[in-house]
A protein has these predicted regions:
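Phosphate-binding P-loop
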Residues: 199-200, 226-233
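Walker A/P-loop nucleotide-binding motif
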Residues: 213, 230-241
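Pre-Walker A adenine-sensing motif
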Residues: 215-229
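Short, hydrophobic/aromatic alpha-helical segments in well-folded domains
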Residues: 206, 223-224, 237
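AAA+ P-loop ATPase mechanoenzymes
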Residues: 1-211, 215
Length: 241
C-alpha cells in the first residue's frame, strides 16, 4: 500500500521500501518468476545491510530502516510538528493515513514470504548486532536516537499511539538533516546556491578533554552560570584547529 502514501512520498533511500512492498504484494503471484523475486529479496537485504552498517544501526534493521525514513523525511506534517509537537487541522488525518501504512510495515510478519521464496535471510536482520559504537555516517548519539525511536514505534499498540510517538520525536529533535545533526558547514558550489551541509560524524568533546586551558574554561563556565542565573553574560564563540 505504499503507493497510497500522501505525505511520505519520494523519500531518499525509499527504493528499498518500494521493492519490499512489491515482494509482499507479489510473492504468491504466478505472474512473476520465483527466482527473480528471490533475487530481488536478496538485493533488498544487501541494500539494507549496506545502509545499516554505514549508519551504525542495530537491532531489527527493517524497523530501524523504516524509522530512519520517518525521521529524515521533511514534509508538510513533519516540519509543522518541529518544536511545537501536535498540530491541528486536516494534516492530522492525512498523517494518520500514512502512519497506518507504516504501522502495517512495522507489524508485517515475513515468515510466509520467506517460506514461499525459500529464503531465510530476513532472520539475520531482525536481531542484528553491530560491531561498532557508530557508523561512518552517524555517530553514536544520532544512531541511538534512531534505534530508540525504532523500538518505541515497534511497541506502539495502535496507529494513534504510533502518531503520538513520532510527533513527540519531531517536537524534541526536529526532522531531516537539521533535526538529526547539531553541526553544519556552509558550502558554495560552483554555479549553484549556497548549501548547508551537516557534519554527520563528529566526536563528543567535553571541557575535561581540553588540556591546558584552565583559565579559559573557568571563564566560560562562570559566564554560562551567570547566563543561566539571569545575570549579565557575554556571547561566546568557541573555535579550534
Amino acid at each position: 500500500r505504499t503507493n497510497e502514501l500522501m505525505l511520505y512520498k519520494n523519500m531518499e533511500y525509499g527504493e528499498i521500501l518500494k521493492d519490499i512492498t512489491f515482494l509482499i504484494d507479489n510473492y504468491e503471484s504466478e505472474f512473476y518468476n520465483k527466482e527473480d523475486l528471490r533475487g530481488l529479496l536478496f538485493d533488498c537485504i544487501n541494500e539494507l545491510l549496506e545502509l545499516s552498517v554505514s549508519h551504525g544501526f542495530e537491532g531489527n534493521l527493517w524497523h530501524t530502516y523504516l524509522t530512519f525514513l520517518l525521521a529524515s523525511d521533511e514534509n508538510a506534517y513533519s516540519t509543522s510538528c518541529e518544536i511545537v509537537g501536535e498540530i491541528e487541522g486536516s494534516l492530522n488525518e492525512i498523517a494518520l493515513h500514512d502512519f497506518a501504512i507504516f504501522k502495517e510495515m512495522f507489524d508485517y510478519d515475513f515468515e510466509e514470504l520467506e517460506k514461499s521464496l525459500d529464503a531465510d535471510c530476513l532472520k539475520i536482520i531482525m536481531d542484528y548486532k553491530s560491531g561498532n559504537s557508530g557508523g561512518k555516517v552517524f555517530n553514536r548519539r544520532v544512531r541511538d536516537r534512531i534505534c530508540d525511536l525504532s523500538r518505541a514505534l515497534a511497541a506502539t499498540q495502535n496507529v494513534d499511539h504510533f502518531k503520538r510517538t513520532l510527533t513527540q520525536f519531531y517536537k524534541e529533535f526536529g526532522v531531516g538533516k537539521l533535526g538529526l545533526h547539531k553541526a553544519f558547514r556552509v558550502e558554495h558550489p560552483d554555479n549553484s546556491d549556497v548549501e548547508i551541509i551537516p557534519i554527520t560524524n563528529i566526536a563528543h568533546v567535553h571541557l575535561d578533554d581540553l588540556v591546558g586551558y584552565e583559565d579559559a574554561k573557568k571563564k566560560l563556565v562562570d559566564n554560562t552560570k551567570a547566563f543561566v542565573e539571569g545575570k549579565k553574560a557575554n556571547n561566546c564563540l568557541m573555535f579550534g584547529d
